[in-house]
Amino acid sequence: SAIWARAPKDITEEQYTEFYRHASHAFDKPWHIIHNRVEGTVNHTSLLFVPSAAPFDLFDAERKSHVKLYVNRVFISDTTKDLIPSYLRFLRGIVDSQDLSLNVSREMLQTDPKLAKIKTSITKKVLGELKKKSNKAPEEFTEFWTNFGAVLKEGLIEDPSLRDRVLELCRFTSTHNQGLSSLSDYIGRCKEGQEAIYYMAGEDATKIAQSPHLEGFKAKNIEVLLLSDPVDEFWLQHVTEFEGKPFKSITRGAADLDNIAEEKKDENSKENVETPDIADLIASI
């Protein structure tokens, strides 16, 4: 029988990997496996894989979905645009449903409301799995983010209904340290009196990190997000705030830093630990 029709407990990791490589024409091991059966409005089974390496054509506008659609284990299409949202186009695998018609044309399938329900169900499941992974294995999630974060951020523009879920997954470089931070991490480190999430966006990560615009913020030890993905300038037009704090560019208008608490410095303070140069940190990532 088809591997996805079997119970997950009866499938070994090696069998999953073998199927992933065969179905995806890939050579890596999957970074994460999502095998899910949904019984409800539209019954369907999905066996999806997040690759451990980014495909060369990830940012190709013409890139087709690598998730195959089956109806009752009969292959229907591997180019169904409305099965997986564009911002999850890194997914590989299959979706099988007994509730779609075998006789419908591919064109008719695109407008089938049942397909839209399957798409929503899968999207929520995948975002939920990524959230769990980010909590349980933050270092592994960093690997995922390095490969696919720039694509996932497209969901902030494409999918307003799930924007908050996508935003929770987003990770950013900042002036705080050389790792990646979530927006919740940033909020937790905000200084007393800090009313905004400060960021600087540009095309070159190293140039951003060396910008003189950062000097006033460094002097007050106020964290600034450093955004260098092409998609960043676009999603910031759609996302205005997070947890009540607005996003504010440090290069547009003068930032009022007077109301933000000064660092209390004394000889025993941890704040006296020398802060590593931000440009060096960016270069090391």
Label every model-predicted segment:
Residues S1-I285:
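Conserved GHKL (Bergerat-fold) ATPase module
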